């Protein structure tokens, strides 16, 4: 049962890559960032589908979205100087705990 979770976590990481990549595509007018973003999106979806063959779809999708949301929020703070507040930090921590809670209860 290790491999489906590995697929899922890599898919979540790639979701962060394509979401952040959208900032660099300039509406998909820049070909290199657009190619990177599209490739990350495609591989992320394929790995999510592969993980969902063995994991409950509700759990797989929730974990995938959670990793993407958490990672994208963190990258927004680190790369794009997006604001961080105490409440945002608390909810990001709760999201992190929720991802692992879903993994351990699946």
Residue ranges and their predicted role:
Residues 1-106:
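Polytopic alpha-helical membrane proteins, predominantly small-molecule transporters/carriers
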């Amino acid at each position: 049962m290790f491999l489906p979770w590995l697929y899922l976590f890599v898919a979540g990481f790639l979701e962060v890559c394509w979401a952040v990549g959208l900032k660099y595509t300039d509406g998909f007018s820049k070909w290199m960032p657009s190619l990177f973003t599209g490739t990350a999106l495609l591989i992320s979806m394929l790995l999510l589908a592969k993980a969902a063959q063995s994991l409950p779809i509700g759990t797989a999708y929730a974990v995938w979205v959670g990793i993407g949301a958490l990672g994208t929020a963190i990258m927004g703070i680190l790369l794009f100087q997006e604001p961080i507040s105490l409440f945002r930090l608390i909810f990001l921590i709760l999201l992190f705990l929720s991802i692992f809670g879903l993994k351990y209860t699946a």
